[in-house]
From Swiss-Prot:
Pfam families: Nop52. The keyword Nucleus applies. It is found in: Nucleus, Nucleolus. One of its GO terms (cellular component) is preribosome, small subunit precursor. Belongs to the RRP1 family. The lineage of its organism: Eukaryota, Fungi, Dikarya, Ascomycota, Taphrinomycotina. It comes from Schizosaccharomyces pombe (strain 972 / ATCC 24843) (Fission yeast). Keywords: Nucleus, rRNA processing. This is Ribosomal RNA-processing protein 1 homolog.
Length: 217
């Protein structure tokens, strides 16, 4: 099911009101219980990327980051992983073209999506096995930003994820972090990556949860 081209163009419009209105329509569009293809979401993220690109004021950047991450639970569950997977694919593809003045807002956007993933895991684990939901997300991350065979994926994104991972995890589980394979994507990359910089730097930047005080389901 393809997103209409005019709709995507409105998301990347120069006029902020046009972009905001398109974003409201997007919520209804994504909530449909209809299957999307990978290309559909890649086209959509192209528009959303430039929507973020043109956000020039800090408060609006924060609001937009929150609004985009808030799309995750709105997306029909059968499309949810693909929606996030294509987000990370878009970040990896566009990263080298982001100038230094825009880097921080995209770091913020990635932080919000990391948090949205953890919240979705928490919500879904109320009706499904936690390990199963975490495994589904881990597969998405290891096929995407943590794919060790993708030598072109920017180190900066992985370093940022290492910096924020546990912080965002603890926000979702402020008291007890349930036992699960939360760090499997990092462990896999550290173990198998041919990138020496990643193997040496990721362990130093990753602040792991030292103890689990709550068993998984």
């Amino acid at each position: 099911m393809s997103a209409p081209s005019p709709f995507i163009k409105k998301l990347a419009a120069n006029d902020r009101k046009t972009r905001d209105k398109a974003l409201e329509s997007l919520q209804r569009f994504l909530s449909q219980k209809k299957k999307f293809e990978r290309l559909d979401f890649l086209k959509l993220w192209k528009g959303l990327f430039y929507c973020m690109w043109m956000a020039d004021k800090p408060l609006y950047q924060q609001k937009l980051s929150d609004n985009l991450a808030a799309l995750v639970p709105i997306v029909w569950i059968d499309n949810r992983i693909l929606f996030q997977s294509t987000f990370w694919e878009t970040m990896g593809r566009e990263w080298t073209g982001i100038d230094i003045l825009r880097t921080d807002k995209f770091y913020l956007l990635m932080r919000r999506f990391c948090a949205a993933a953890f919240r979705d895991i928490q919500t879904r684990s109320k009706t499904a096995l936690l390990d199963k939901v975490v495994a589904e997300y881990n597969q998405m991350w290891m096929d995407g930003p943590f794919n060790t065979e993708n030598l072109a994926f920017p180190n900066g994104i992985l370093f940022h994820l290492a910096d924020i991972w546990t912080e965002e995890l603890r926000k979702v589980y402020p008291e007890d972090v349930p036992k699960a394979d939360w760090y499997l994507p990092f462990d896999s990359t550290i173990k198998s990556s041919h990138n020496v910089v990643l193997r040496k730097t990721l362990p130093k930047r990753l602040d792991r949860v030292s103890e689990y005080t709550k068993d998984s389901q």
